[in-house]
Amino acid sequence: MLSYYLRLASKSFRRTPGLTGLMICAIACGIGACIVTLTVYHAVSGNPIWWKNNVLYAVTMDSWDPTQPADSDNPTLPPPQLTYRDATYLMTSSIPKHKAIMTQLLGMLSGARGQRAPVPVMTRATTADFFPMFDVPFEFGGGWNAAADQGPGPVMVLSHTENEKLFGGANSVGQTLIWNGRQFRIIGVLKEWQPAPRFYDLNEGGGFSRTEDAYVPFNWAPTLQQMPSGHMDSWGTQSITNYQEFINSESNWIEMWVELPTAASRADMLAFMNSYWAEQRKAGRFQRPINNHLTNVGDWLKVNHVVSADNSILLRLAFAFLAVCLINTIGILLAKFLKRSAVTGLLRALGASRRQIFWQHLVEVGAIAAAGATAGVVVGIIGLKAVQALYDTGNSDFGGSNYAALAHFDPVGIAWALGLAALSTVAAGLYPAWTIGRLPPSRYLKSQ
């Protein structure tokens, strides 16, 4: 019977190609809009390191101005970064399995013998545990050790993109580069690694900046007396005339993350932070109420509002648009089926059951759904390509955004799109198919 119903559907399409094409276009536009917004929303709202969500924690302490909160919109939250003195002290704790402090620096990178002109590169100054703690994948070599942190050692890890630029993707471990006037030996090259959102530093680009081009031990920042190029907050009227005064100031510019695999280690780390807070309060700092936090990745993304209200509104609008398209499709299907009511009445008079009439029209709806799904996937791909083109300015250059990387089509997305298209269209076609199946045949036979 299915093949017979398909033949009837094919004849129906040929009789009304305009209406059929209109329904397919309506479904395709609605599905395409949903694909684009759902894909981007899923990317920005996802947890890029979900498997370690309950063991990785951002460390925050409220050393801010006692007369006002760090964020007037969220007065209960401490600053998202730490001061230099607080970060370096907390790094002395042996409680975490892994711990890392970090900031963003601007570096000038060139070849060791002048064979490459200096180019600006965004650099992550961090500590050795950054790589194992965040499961950063290496293509060649690896990260540095604790001794290089203390030195600091003249070692560097390159990103996949930067290694492609400088060495054509070849194994560059052991090569030497000049970074900010100092020679650095490459000890590792990353695989392509673009966590979205960039959870470990949400202060730049709302968490959607690309990862850095190079990574060096954190202590190179104070050794070279280099100011951070990333986000920095300060308060008060303190005068800062040199680098030593800067690192001793109440300026917040360092992110800190710890890996705490057990509830006991989390409690111990928080107790360590509270004890330090009490000591500093006696010394005249931390005059605000105690507000120390260990925040896991998922909660960190929420409190920093990574998914903006605009994204949620766009998602709702896209589904509303799909609903409008489906309502229009229902109207067209109903008009089309009712126009053939005389034929349907004749079939009923000849012995066709309501169920058979229902399934005949539902198969026709399913064929339209399949065509609409296919066209919707095409529209969705075109839409995602448009988003990539819109945000692909400087995507692989200094300071580039990672928004374009979010708009990618994956097999799971295709499966969801096809399922969404088929189910929504068939659901929309149930009412017209049910209506035509319940029409009394005598009424239409008498009119002929």
Where do the protein language model's features map onto the residues?
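Membrane-helix entry/capping segments
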Residues: M1-Y4, K11, R15, L19, ...
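Generic structural signal for small/hydrophobic residues in well-ordered secondary structure
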Residues: F13-T16, I35, V44, A58-M61, ...
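Small-residue-rich transmembrane alpha-helices
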Residues: G366-R438
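Alpha-helical transmembrane segments of integral membrane proteins
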Residues: L19-A33, L315-G331, E364-G376, G413-A417, ...
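Structured, solvent-exposed hinge/loop segments at the ends of secondary-structure elements
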Residues: L38-L166, A170, W179-F184, P195, ...
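Short, strongly hydrophobic transmembrane alpha-helices
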Residues: T16-W50
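Mid-to-C-terminal secondary-structure elements
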Residues: A128-G143, P154-N304
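Intracellular coupling helices
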Residues: L6-G18, I327-I368, R438-L439, R443-S447
